[in-house]
Amino acid sequence: MRPAADITLGGRYTLTERIAIGGMGEVWKARDKVLGRIVAVKILKEEYTGDPGFLERFRAEARNTALLNHPGVANVFDYGEEDNSAYLVMELVPGSPLSSIIEREGTLPPDRVLNFIAQTARALAAAHSQGLVHRDVKPGNLIITPDDRVKVTDFGIARLANQVPLTATGQV
């Protein structure tokens, strides 16, 4: 299935607009018809759904992120597979990636940067306390809300500290 506006996944999540395109898939804004809320739906690229390794990484992202309950981590609500597609339903975080803010504003004031670092560290500490290692912390994976709260996103290559990694050393 190729994602498009007005497609409904799982009989529940109606896609409304594409928010972003990444290496493993697309993120869409969607309406949850059951709960009446707006969510983000990350859809794995079709070319990867036939690859058991990629599909397992995507499932692992859903499982691993769902373990977390912290205000600095975007919540995962659901996961599904249908019509040769896999998707992850999560909190739609208002705001912009830190990478976009840096592009737009240039050098940020040190106190603001320190605030972002402290919030990110707290969110990662919560992940680490549950044995989850993010492995891809970068400005593009930190969403900054309008009131300067940080939400860590994209645990796509995260792993549980006690598990064998799904990627070989040196691969992303």
Protein language model features and the residues they cover:
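Protein kinase catalytic-loop region centered on the HRD/HxD motif
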Residues: T120-L132
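Activation segment signature within eukaryotic-like protein kinase domains
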Residues: F116-I117
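Conserved short submotifs of the Hanks-type protein kinase catalytic core
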Residues: D83-P97, I101
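Conserved N-lobe loop of protein kinases adjacent to the ATP-binding glycine-rich P-loop
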Residues: R31-I38
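Protein kinase glycine-rich loop
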Residues: L15-G22, V27
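Activation-segment/catalytic-loop signature of the eukaryotic protein kinase fold
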Residues: Y79
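AlphaC helix of the eukaryotic protein kinase fold
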Residues: I43-L67
